[in-house]
Amino acid sequence: MRGAANLTSAMEVAADLRQRILLGELKPGARLKIDDVASLCDVSHMPVRVALQALEAEGVLDVYPHRGAVIRAVDARFVRNTLELRAAIEVMLTEKCARLIDKDGLAELEALVLDFEQAAQSQDPLAVVSANLRLHEAINRVAENTEALRVLSRGRLLIQALRVRYGFGPGRVENVIVEHRALFRAIARKDERRAGEIARKHCEGARDELLALL
């Protein structure tokens, strides 16, 4: 039972740290000491160690012997490399989604497209980022490629934190709404090629616009 409790605590610690990183309370380059995190989250050392290992696996932390964990530094190269990799993978997954999706899946995507548009009206970067992630996760899941999803998850939190920090440039959210609608139509028509083209343009636009904000 103690092992299960430690695992639950570790999951809670990891979730807490993710939220703090996302909101900018913990910034790239910050060192996370086990003692400090344990005090912050009111847990023992073991759940903290497990949580830090999980975040390292997600590409969020670098862990060094005798130095502890450090939130990965984020610069233009990191953003460019991460989003170019995302583009390559999401094009593949989106094309497969267009081929495999069923009526229930389409209904879910349509609802998530609308959820994003409602979030956009709030002008809250965190709400927009979260709604965008839910939509793209739903598209990507249809392809049933867990290895691709694992790669996509690496470093994603750090990109999201940049979005929450810097927001979106003029007209970007409006462009995203247009692209989401076009992407949904292509998927609904099972037009794999067009869906892939839109996905690539969508990812490249996100990359270029975020780099311009740095």
Segments (PLM) and residue ranges:
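Short linear motifs at protein or domain termini
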Residues: 1-99, 141, 207-214
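Mobile beta-alpha loop/short-helix "lid" or hinge segments that flank ligand
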Residues: 56-57, 61-62, 155-157, 171-174
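Short helix-capping and inter-helix turn/linker motifs at the boundaries of alpha-helical repeat units
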Residues: 8, 106-107, 171-174
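Alpha-helix N-cap/N′ positions at the starts of helices
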Residues: 12, 66, 89, 108-111, ...
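Hydrophobic/aromatic-rich alpha-helical bundle segments in the mid-to-C-terminal region
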Residues: 169-173, 190-198
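Short amphipathic alpha-helical interaction/hinge segments
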Residues: 159-170, 207-214
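Short, flexible helix-adjacent loops and helix caps
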Residues: 22, 26, 94, 98-102, ...
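Conserved amphipathic alpha-helical segments that form helical-bundle/coiled-coil interaction surfaces
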Residues: 82, 86, 103-164, 178-186, ...
